[in-house]
Amino acid sequence: MAKALLTPRAVDFPRWYQDVIAKAELAENGPARGSMVIRPTGYALWERIQRELDDRIKAAGAANAYFPLLIPESYMRREAEHVEGFSPELAVVTIGGGKLLEEPLVIRPTSETVVGESMARWIESYRDLPLLLNQWSNVVRWELRPRLFLRTTEFLWQEGHTAHVSETDAHDYARRILHDVYEDVLVNVLGMPVVVGRKTVRERFAGATSTYTLEAMMGDGKALQMGTSHELGQNFARAFGIDYLSASGRRELVWTTSWGITTRLIGGIIMAHGDDLGLRVPPRLAPVQAAVLVVREGSGVAEVAHTLTAALRGAGVRVELDERVGVPFGRRAIDAELKGYPVRIEIGPRDIAESRVVLVRRVTGERIAVPIDSVVNLVTAALEADQTALFTEALARQRQRTADVTSVAEAIEASSTGWARLPWSDVGSDGEAELNTHGITVRCLVRADGGVPDSEDEPGLVALVGRAY
């Protein structure tokens, strides 16, 4: 019955993706083209992602702040490469209060410019550095081919902005965010194996000197960029006059970074972990880790349901108690399955009579009757096991669908089903341009040992190539 709710992934992966979003009540299209309404189930996922990221960002020393949504157009023009890169995506306000504005205002596509203007006022001496800021906000980038969570005109994100006394300090901090914050959350919370690498000059962020990325493989073999961290050199410092009095008494420009992750991660969770029954949420991320479902009323059923719910919460499990016996049980069970709750506990009169409950694991599909007094231990063990299982499954797919090749032609062929790896020296700028004509990009460059390079000119680099969302 549940399978009929969704288009099978093997039949039409994009349609399956849209079906999951709709049936699991994650989001829907907004009234303006490219806009998105994030429904409570979807927003709960974003809140969990926010919490995991925010804790780590603060542990890295950054403080949250908020900067204006409306940015004077002249700010964007101060950094030539930046405005050139974003110009096709800008939404601009020209009328306010019924009158033509003296200067058009850009609706925030990213905040390097407006943050840079504030940094120039806040930083006076080396004692004010490093300045480490983070913002949770929405941004607008005009999207011609919108797709829920993956590409929408307006989306939610966090964007970090930092200023440092030296290039080395900025480099180290950009890499710290990349690994200690982003990679940690993606791998250990979202159960998402990622390739961490360096973007080519063609693919790097507009105005950056270096862009680092985390790339994940989706269920159809395509790549999804999960997050980026940028070294901005002194480009924005020069454009906005962000300087400081050094310990030696000289005025010097700061070195800046920026980094961000968006609601795109929710799309990644769907496509990396979902199956033909719907969403499968990694237990460490899941807003609801266990759903306690009362099958129907009966002597002792409600009491056991409440007792188990309290015991699970006492063990640190995030629980939802569903006592809506007026709603058909099958519908409620399918709903829990679609939304990817890791564990479902079913309790009915027959179960109480036999001093047991039924435990259903979303990842494995296992359905077993278990003694009531063993539920808490079994649930906590299942959550850890299934977190590992989702990561292992995704990693196996990534390895199976990544081909080592020796030419651009072979990379193009391999990209029809997954990723290709080949020496960067065999690609170069000409090969990258050839790949682009086929809708394929160099996702990132890595060292032969999997490390992240400091320059794309390092010898022996490997290019990861594929189609992407």
Task: Give each language-model segment a name.
Residues 1-469:
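NTP/phosphate- and nucleic-acid-binding module
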